[in-house]
């Protein structure tokens, strides 16, 4: 529990998205019916360690930033964007809930973090009212989710197009989205992507009704639901999924190997 809390605390400061895995571990822990007393003790240890690590790193990093780079609280208040900014961008129809430079420029027009937060909240509520329930659901499933999960290159070809390194290199022409040979890249990545997701779905289906074998991969399934919910609420981008690729590969392998095992037993 202590080790997990330390790792989660460090992860929180590096990048918040993988922190979803820590939350998935906690949820999976409580979905198990046995050993409630031990689970409560373990959770308490994790939370105390997590809180301590986050606080310690936060204090040290703030002091380091001020001493080495002159980044004071006043500078942060002037330039730092609140979390509400990315939620606001996630509701922009023009970008299908993705990054929007207009929103970035708009948030930057306000002088303090408090003003930016209040204005972001106002825009968020206004955009939700404009959607309505039915249109918002349609926006999620037909705009945001395809923009998130419908890119087999995880936006890598787009970023390479923006800042190409050795643009005339044959490999770059294969990888960037407007390259002369990019179709070969798409054939490979989409084949891999479909096989990957088919294995993940297979793993979930084969786990139904078999609780005994479900537990090892339960954390991965909960984390996948978590990242999907995160992308719905946040500014969506397919590159956020890259962090979870190792876990997705393990889940796909579980699906294929379990299927093979079941077929072997049936014979």
Which residue stretches match the model-derived regions?
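Transmembrane alpha-helix segments characteristic
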Residues: 3-8, 212-231
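Hydrophobic/aromatic-rich transmembrane helices and adjacent perimembrane loops
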Residues: 8-27, 192-193, 237-257
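Membrane-proximal stem/loop segments at transmembrane-domain junctions that anchor or position
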Residues: 63-169
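Membrane-interface alpha helices of multi-pass inner-membrane proteins
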Residues: 1-15, 25-27, 46-54, 228-229
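Transmembrane-helix signature of polytopic, lipid-linked glycan biosynthesis machinery
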Residues: 10-12, 58, 224-238
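Membrane-interface anchor segments at the N-terminal boundary of transmembrane helices
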Residues: 140-220
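A juxtamembrane structural motif centered on a specific transmembrane helix
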Residues: 205-217, 249-267
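Perimembrane helix-loop-helix junctions
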Residues: 21-52, 250, 258, 262
């Amino acid at each position: 529990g202590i080790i997990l809390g330390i790792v989660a605390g460090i992860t929180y400061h590096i990048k918040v998205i993988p922190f979803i895995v820590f939350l998935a571990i906690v949820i999976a822990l409580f979905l198990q019916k046995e050993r409630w007393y031990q689970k409560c003790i373990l959770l308490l240890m994790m939370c105390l360690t997590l809180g301590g690590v986050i606080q310690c790193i936060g204090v040290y990093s703030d002091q380091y930033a001020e001493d080495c780079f002159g980044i004071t609280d006043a500078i942060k208040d002037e330039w730092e964007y609140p979390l509400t900014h990315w939620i606001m961008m996630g509701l922009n129809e023009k970008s299908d809930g993705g990054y929007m430079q207009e929103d970035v420029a708009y948030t930057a027009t306000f002088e303090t973090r408090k003003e930016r937060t209040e204005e972001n909240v106002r825009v968020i509520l206004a955009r939700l009212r404009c959607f309505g329930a039915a249109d918002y659901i349609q926006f999620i499933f037909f705009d945001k989710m395809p923009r998130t999960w419908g890119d087999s290159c995880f936006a890598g070809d787009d970023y390479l197009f923006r800042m190409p390194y050795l643009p005339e290199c044959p490999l770059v022409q294969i990888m960037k989205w407007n390259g002369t040979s990019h179709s070969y890249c798409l054939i490979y990545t989409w084949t891999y992507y479909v096989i990957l997701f088919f294995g993940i779905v297979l793993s979930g289906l084969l786990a139904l009704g078999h609780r005994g074998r479900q537990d090892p991969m339960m954390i991965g399934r909960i984390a996948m639901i978590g990242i999907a919910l995160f992308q719905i609420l946040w500014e969506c981008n397919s590159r956020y999924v890259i962090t979870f690729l190792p876990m997705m590969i393990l889940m796909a392998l579980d699906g294929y190997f379990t299927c093979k095992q079941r077929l072997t037993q049936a014979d």
